[in-house]
């Protein structure tokens, strides 16, 4: 362990929570900023709002996800269990930093979709072992509400699946609304944290939409909560980074999650700077050998 990390652990490693913060914060940032961010995260997670053990943000950590989604997804399925351990994720880019790589390593199978040919080529190279054993498919496709169901059918996936993850920086709301071919038990979807509750807003649908890097994208958390209710889902939490919301099918959620299932209760503001943090060395997916 480097002197820098030893100092960090000494300063913030007094409890399990703070040790988690130290691990989460180690990586790309200089020592002073690591310490500042570690203290900030620790302070936020130890506030009364986050004291309830049902609050998912307490369980976040990063392995291959952009921020703390890996830990939250793990905790959701610890509570509700799994069925066919099948996922679909779109907007994966090159697959190195997304919400389902850890699931692949945990033995899941699924489908990735991305609209860029070079990303799909890199996925086929970097994840060749998962293609070889038949657990991963990847399709190059520009995703919109008109195409999404046929893409699932092309991949031979329909009916119940355990997880759907949506991050396309634009039409996320409209694409989720259009999905009929699959019925995921859990949905992870990006929300626009600039549009705080109670605002219920979504950008108008444009099948050719591409994100321009501004705050004009996607849907507010309240808009997604309302759509979720229409589709039979309840909001169970948001990532600490304020990037993703987590929904669970009503009949699956039971009493496992914090009430009320409202945007006001679960909203997290944008802390996108946490995407600069790593879980250690630069990410490199397996294959690993299970022993």
Where are these regions (language model features)?
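A short alpha/beta connector and helix-capping loop motif
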Residues: 134-137, 174-210
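Active-site glycine- and acidic-residue-rich loops that bind
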Residues: 165-175
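Short SAM/SAH-binding signature in class I
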Residues: 159-165, 186
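Extended alpha-helical segments
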Residues: 1-44
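Rossmann-like AdoMet/SAM-dependent catalytic core
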Residues: 18, 32-81, 88, 96, ...
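Short amphipathic alpha-helix with an adjacent loop that forms part of the alpha/beta core around
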Residues: 148-158, 177-180
């Amino acid at each position: 362990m480097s002197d820098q990390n030893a100092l960090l652990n000494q300063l913030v490693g007094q409890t399990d929570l703070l040790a988690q913060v130290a691990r989460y914060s180690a990586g790309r940032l200089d020592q002073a900023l690591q310490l500042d961010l570690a203290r900030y995260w620790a302070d936020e997670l130890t506030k009364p709002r986050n004291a309830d053990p049902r609050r998912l943000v307490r369980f976040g950590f990063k392995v291959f996800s952009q921020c703390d989604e890996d830990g939250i997804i793990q905790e959701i399925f610890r509570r509700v269990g799994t069925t066919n351990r099948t996922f679909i994720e779109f907007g994966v880019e090159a697959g190195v930093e997304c919400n389902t790589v850890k699931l692949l390593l945990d033995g899941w199978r699924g489908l990735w979709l991305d609209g860029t040919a070079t990303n799909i080529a890199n996925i086929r190279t970097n994840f060749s072992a998962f293609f070889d054993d038949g657990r991963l498919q990847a399709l190059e496709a520009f995703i919109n509400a008109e195409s999404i169901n046929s893409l699932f059918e092309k991949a031979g996936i329909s009916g119940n699946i355990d997880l759907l993850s949506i991050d396309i920086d634009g039409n996320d709301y409209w694409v989720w609304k259009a999905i009929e071919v699959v019925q995921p038990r859990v949905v992870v979807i990006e929300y626009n944290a600039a549009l705080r509750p109670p605002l219920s807003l979504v950008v108008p649908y444009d099948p050719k939409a591409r994100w321009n890097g501004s705050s004009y994208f996607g849907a507010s958390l309240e808009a997604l909560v309302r759509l979720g209710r229409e589709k039979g889902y309840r909001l169970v939490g948001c990532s600490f980074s304020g990037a993703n919301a987590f929904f669970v099918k009503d009949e699956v959620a039971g009493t496992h999650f914090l009430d009320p299932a409202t945007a006001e209760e679960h909203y997290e503001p944008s802390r996108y700077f946490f995407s600069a943090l790593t879980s250690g060395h630069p990410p490199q997916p397996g294959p690993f050998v299970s022993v």
